[in-house]
């Protein structure tokens, strides 16, 4: 993961992962 994507994922704007697509796991990118 990258810091940039991590920041956007915190807002649930980048559904890179299945669960994050729903914006329910904004921290998931930290583990992927």
UniProtKB/Swiss-Prot annotation:
Q: What else is known?
A: On the 2D-gel the determined pI of this protein is: 5.7, its MW is: 22.8 kDa.
Please identify the protein, giving its name as recorded.
Answer: Putative leucine-rich repeat protein PS14
